[in-house]
Amino acid sequence: MFRNKIVLEEKFRLNVERLLYALVFTMVFEGLIRKLLPSAVGLLIFFLKDIFCITGLYFITKAFAKPNVQRNPFFNLRKIFFFVFLPPLIVTNFYDPSLVLFALKQYLLYMILALLVPLAFVPAKIERFKKFFFFFSLTVIPTTLVAVLQNSLPANHWLNQSVDGQSLEAFSAGGLLRVSSTFSFTGQYSWFLNVVCVILAVSFCLPIKRDNIIIKKIAPLLPLVISVCLAVGAFITGGRTAVLGCGLVLFLGFIFAVIKAPQKIITRGLILMAVMGLSLTALRIAKPEFFKVYDLRSEDKKDETHSEEVEGRILKDMFGWTVWIAEQDMIPFLFGNGLGVMSNGAEKISSYARDVRMQGISTESEIDSTAWEGGMYLVLIWFGMRIWVIIRCIGLWRQARDTNTIIAMSFLLGYITVIGFYGALSRQPPIAIWFWLSIGCFVALYYYDKSLQSSNA
């Protein structure tokens, strides 16, 4: 009986693990697959990540129904947030009932990944968790190869077109196309690079066992190959989100690591920075075309420098909404104009969202969208929840003791902090999925550290 229970639990854990692998694979290669398949099948691929998350919700319901399961630090977050989320949801129902389920998906569904990852990778399965990080970091190689191929192809080639077969020349910079690699559009590629640079840092801190002859042979070269691919990928997109985002999350992760483990991280960090600096210099000399689009987008303009432009965009994103929200009527001011309206795809399921778009109403930043969709109420609870998540993660990070785990958690915390403050979690499912997945990885590492502390006690 006891043996059967262990077998069933391991089978359950493996199913959750496979689901996470399938989710990451789909997220990375969705755009390329949709370009290769008919549009009707491509639409199914588009919703596949949501189907995986709904399946994950079933696994979570089943797992947490057991009385002896370890309670996740974020277990009650989804339930509590659902109840405080009700007022703008009720208001949305008056605008268009079809938006209610869509809004729940956009704001709440992907939170389940914070619970799902620790179910798949329990402390006793740390080697399998390391392999997951290793697999995730390896995806940089094929995505960069596709991006390099796109960079050498004309704009009218099918690989450089959208998933609907339309030209993407409108998104070019200085007449040069901004590549999207295996993703549906350039932004998705940039968001992927932001998270995978952190996953790469984690896989360096927690390397897999070299118990395979192939891994033994390629392991010494892989860190350099993946790092170079990451650098090429970040610059070849031509997007500042990729370059500045990767730099910021790695820098913040490094700061967190220095605070908790200065002896181990400072020397390694300086060596890594020197290697990356030399690699970038060599790449610029050998392949200047990889940097051309980014350089064009980063040039100083006549009326402002590049740094002034970036600063202006950030300030506009953070405070631009305060100009127009005071002009709203009382109900829109407090509870918004309908959740999910500003998200991609809303116009396909909602006539109200379609009418709003036809009126030319649009928002740029996350806080703009939140204020327009849910009013001041949603701004307070949505960003309050995100700040609470960051503070909760910092609390867990402070409890960690194992040096390698601390460093790995520090880089994840850097990503969680940056995206938690600035990421478009309500508008862009890919960002939300990477964000909550990274929190799940963070919690799983926290559990692993706790198990090490218990075994050493």
Predicted regions: what is each one?
Residues R13-L20, V24-F25, P73-F82, V117-N156, ...:
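Interfacial loop-to-transmembrane-helix boundary motif in multi-pass membrane proteins
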Residues V16-K35, D50-L108, L413-I416:
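N-terminal hydrophobic segments of proteins, predominantly signal-anchor/transmembrane helices
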Residues R18-M27, P220-V228, R392-G423, C441:
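Loop-to-helix entry and N-terminal half of a specific, functionally important transmembrane alpha helix
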Residues L32, E304-G374:
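Long extracytoplasmic/lumenal interhelical loops at the membrane interface
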Residues I54-I60, V196-V198, L250-F251, A408-A457:
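Transmembrane alpha-helices of multi-pass inner-membrane enzymes
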Residues F133-Q161, F171-G174, S181-I259:
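Alpha-helical transmembrane segments of multi-pass inner-membrane proteins
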Residues L145, Q150-A155, T237, F254-H306, ...:
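A membrane-periplasm/extracellular boundary helix in multi-pass inner-membrane enzymes
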Residues F185-G187, R354-C393:
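A conserved mid-to-late transmembrane alpha helix and its immediate loop/hinge
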